[in-house]
């Protein structure tokens, strides 16, 4: 399985059950609190990652937009060296994300036509090794095998974000101490 979502066929229908819909409706009562927590987490990531060369935290691009801060993502400069990157795609991917409920699928090869940069995968694996779950940004739809023959209108931005981006933990249970630990492990993974 790959550490990013790879869609090779169409045919799954993951509709929300009535129970999940009820849980979702109940979550609406704490939505503002969750968004405030995510916003606080983003601010903490911003403060703790300030000055880390080669890593940029994605922020709200303009006051004209209002982010829900669902994901806190970083971009790794391609020239940033991360420990272990030289061997990162030589073995089967560990800690890969799966489909519904974490179900993983067997990968036919170690590589696909498009995958995150070596330093991004090395950082994901370094974080995974210390119990921190992260994942690459979503693979662009036009790069998914299932859509390879479809028309596309692209400018390179989605490919660049996919190759350089990493999603960091930011859920409602992530504490300030967790963020400090995550950032410290990010710093530990960077070659000096």
Give the positions of each predicted feature.
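PLP-dependent aminotransferase class I/II
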Residues: 1-192
């Amino acid at each position: 399985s790959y550490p990013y979502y790879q869609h090779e066929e169409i045919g799954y229908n993951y509709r929300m059950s009535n129970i999940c819909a009820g849980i979702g409706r109940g979550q609406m009562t704490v939505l503002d609190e969750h968004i405030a927590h995510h916003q606080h987490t983003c601010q903490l990531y911003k403060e703790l990652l300030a000055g880390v060369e080669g890593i940029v935290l994605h922020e709200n691009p303009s006051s004209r937009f209002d982010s829900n801060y669902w994901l806190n993502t970083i971009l790794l400069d391609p020239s940033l060296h991360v420990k272990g990157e030289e061997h990162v795609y030589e073995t089967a991917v560990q800690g890969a994300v799966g489909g519904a409920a974490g179900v993983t699928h067997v990968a036919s090869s170690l590589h696909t036509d498009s995958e995150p940069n070596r330093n991004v995968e090395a950082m994901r694996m370094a974080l995974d090794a210390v119990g921190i779950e992260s994942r690459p940004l979503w693979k662009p739809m036009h790069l998914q095998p299932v859509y390879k023959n479809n028309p596309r209108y692209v400018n390179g931005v989605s490919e660049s974000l996919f190759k350089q981006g990493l999603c960091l933990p930011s859920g409602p249970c992530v504490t300030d101490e967790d963020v400090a630990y995550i950032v410290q492990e990010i710093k530990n993974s960077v070659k000096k």
